[in-house]
C-alpha cells in the first residue's frame, strides 16, 4: 500500500508531484494461486518499517517542515537536509512517514514564522506514531487576547504565538498592549518573541512602546500603519514577508534593531531626512540594520508632492549602484530572500 508510488518497468517509482515520506508505504506478503489468477495480500501481517509523525497545527494552513537526519518511508537513503511543503487538514493535522534518527531536528514554520523546533533524543521506532505540537492560540476577541497573553506569561513562555482574525483592528491591538502592560512586572524587557498570524494589518500605534518585544513575526500582514512599532526600543528583529504598504515612522524609535525582512513594497510613506521615514530620524540616514527584500523588489522613488515612495519599474537587485541604500536610508546590508 503506497499511494505516492506507481509501478513502472517492474519497479515502484514516485508518482509525478509526489514526495517520499508524505504518505504510507506498507509492505505486505502476497500469496499467488498456482494458476496465477488470484493474488491475496495479508495486510494484517503487513510491516511498517518506519514511524509516523503527526504535526498538530492550525487547520487548513500551509506549513514548511525542515528535517535533518531523516529517512523517508519507502527509501533507504537518509536525508541530511529535507524540506517539506505540507498543508494541514481541517482538524489541523499534517503527517510525515519515515525514520528520525537520534538528534534529528524538526522545525515547523508557517511562512517565515517558526511554530516549533523539536530534537529527537533517540531514533524513532518502526510502526510507532509520534506527535509534535505546533499549535497556535486562536484569540479573536479582546478578552481572549488578554487572557492568552496572561496565561502564556504565567507559563513562563517567551515565544507567544497568536492566531488573530484577518480584520483584527484597534480593539484587538489595544488588548495586546494592555495585556503586556498588565504583566509588566513578570516580563523582562526584550525577551518576548511575538508572532501574530492571520491579521492583515497593524493599525496606527498598534504595537507601539512594547518594551517586552525582542522580535516580531507578521507572516500575513500586508499593511503597517503609522507609528505601529514606534519606540519598541528592545526590538531586535522584524519579519513581515508579505507587507507591501508601510506608513510614516512605523519602526521609529528603535535602539536594538538589527534585522528587518519585508515584502515587495509598493507604497511607503515618509521621507527619511525629515524624520517622517519608516525608521524615523537617523545620523546621516545610516542604519546598523541588515535589510532583507524579495528578489523582485523594485527601486523606490520619492514623490515630494505626494510624500510617498513608489516603485519605478527597475529591479532593485539588478541596479548596479544600489549600494545598500533603500528608501533614503543607508543600511549595513541589503540582501534578497526568496
Predicted regions and their residues:
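Short, acidic Ser/Thr/Gly-rich low-complexity loop/linker segments typical of extracellular
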Residues: 72-94
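Structured interaction patches on ligand/partner-binding surfaces of diverse proteins
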Residues: 1-40, 110-135
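Structural signature of tandem-repeat unit edges
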Residues: 159-167, 188-201, 211-223, 233-245, ...
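Core hydrophobic positions of leucine-rich repeats
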Residues: 175-183, 202-213, 224-234, 246-257, ...
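Beta-strand-rich domain onsets/edges
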Residues: 36-51
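Structural motif
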Residues: 50-68
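Short Pro-Gly-centered beta-turn/loop motif in secreted/extracellular proteins
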Residues: 1-7, 93-105
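Extracellular/surface-exposed low-complexity segments
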Residues: 30, 130-136, 288-338
Amino acid at each position: 500500500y503506497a499511494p505516492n508510488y506507481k509501478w513502472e518497468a517492474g519497479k515502484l517509482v514516485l508518482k509525478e508531484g509526489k514526495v517520499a515520506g508524505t504518505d504510507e508505504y506498507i509492505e505486505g506478503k502476497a500469496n499467488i494461486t498456482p494458476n496465477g489468477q488470484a493474488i491475496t495480500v495479508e495486510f494484517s501481517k503487513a510491516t511498517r518499517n518506519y514511524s509516523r509523525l503527526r504535526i498538530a497545527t492550525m487547520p487548513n494552513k500551509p506549513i514548511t517542515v525542515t528535517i535533518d537526519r531523516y529517512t523517508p518511508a519507502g527509501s533507504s537513503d537518509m536525508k541530511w537536509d529535507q524540506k517539506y511543503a505540507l498543508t494541514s487538514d481541517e482538524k489541523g493535522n499534517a503527517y510525515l512517514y519515515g525514520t528520525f534518527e537520534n538528534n534529528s531536528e524538526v522545525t515547523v514554520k508557517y511562512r517565515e514564522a517558526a511554530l516549533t523546533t523539536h530534537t529527537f533524543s533517540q531514533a524513532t521506532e518502526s510502526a510507532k506514531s509520534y506527535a509534535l505540537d505546533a499549535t497556535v492560540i486562536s484569540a479573536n476577541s479582546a478578552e481572549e487576547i488578554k487572557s492568552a497573553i496572561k496565561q502564556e506569561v504565567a507559563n513562563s513562555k517567551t515565544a507567544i504565538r497568536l492566531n488573530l482574525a484577518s480584520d483584527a483592528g484597534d480593539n484587538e491591538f489595544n488588548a495586546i498592549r494592555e495585556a503586556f502592560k498588565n504583566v509588566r512586572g513578570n516580563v523582562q524587557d526584550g525577551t518576548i518573541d511575538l508572532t501574530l498570524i492571520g491579521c492583515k494589518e497593524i493599525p496606527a500605534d498598534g504595537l507601539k512602546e512594547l518594551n517586552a518585544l525582542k522580535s516580531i513575526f507578521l507572516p500575513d500582514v500586508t499593511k503597517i500603519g503609522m507609528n505601529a512599532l514606534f519606540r519598541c526600543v528592545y526590538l531586535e528583529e522584524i519579519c513581515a514577508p508579505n507587507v507591501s504598504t508601510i506608513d510614516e515612522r512605523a519602526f521609529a524609535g528603535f535602539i536594538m534593531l538589527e534585522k528587518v525582512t519585508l515584502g515587495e513594497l509598493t507604497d511607503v510613506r515618509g521621507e527619511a531626512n525629515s524624520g517622517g521615514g519608516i525608521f524615523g530620524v537617523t545620523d546621516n540616514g545610516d542604519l546598523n540594520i541588515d535589510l532583507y527584500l524579495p528578489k523582485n523588489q523594485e527601486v523606490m522613488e520619492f514623490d515630494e508632492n505626494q510624500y510617498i515612495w513608489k516603485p519605478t519599474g527597475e529591479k532593485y537587485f539588478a541596479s548596479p549602484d544600489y549600494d545598500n541604500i533603500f528608501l533614503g536610508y543607508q543600511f549595513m546590508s541589503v540582501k534578497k530572500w526568496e
